[in-house]
Amino acid sequence: MTVQDILDLVRFKFANVALAENNDAIIKIIYLGVSELYRKFNLSIKSETIRVTPDLALYELRNKDVALFLSLYDRTGKELKQSDVINSVEWDYKIVNYRSFILNKPENGLLYALYKASPIVLKDSKDEIDIPDAMIDALLCYIGYMIHSTVTSYTSINGRSGTSESDLYYQKFLTLCNDLEMQGFKIPLNSESLSVIVKGYI
């Protein structure tokens, strides 16, 4: 699905709202909606190969789409132990921030870092939007929430102000996200599922 497909749906669904003639503003709102879905659901899990040397302990993921560093694996697919306790003695690495980590005992070799990826920045109507079709309604509700958030004097047929319409669309968005979670779209990021990705089955 392309940005233009969503633009067409937006202009149809919100025909009674004074939308900007220029698509740029709407594309920015579409991107915010896609980003929110990526934040709520694990729509893109990627890996980056890290070359380790003994004289360097601090490493940073270089890929531009890193949203959140998740875990670290050796070349056999074994998950390294993360320190989640202050002053812990037994640990392989500690997370510094969303894209950096420190190794306890760095050795020559390769490690594989798994991370949650951000969506591509949408700039053009021809750009592809990588979300399941089942999430389109949720995306449109988020767009409706954002559109009505910017409307200060709009009054709908039933008398609601723009702010009330905004709240209504956001509640619909949350409800649809809960439905998607119940349908199995929110896959937990546990060690077993991540190790399968590392070994190349996904």
Protein language model features and the residues they cover:
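Short amphipathic beta-strand/extended segments with alternating polar/hydrophobic composition
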Residues: 79-88
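Generic amphipathic, hydrophobic interface segment in small proteins and small subunits
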Residues: 32-49
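Solvent-exposed beta-hairpin/edge-strand motifs
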Residues: 62-79
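Short, conserved alpha-helical segments within structured domains
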Residues: 22-29, 54
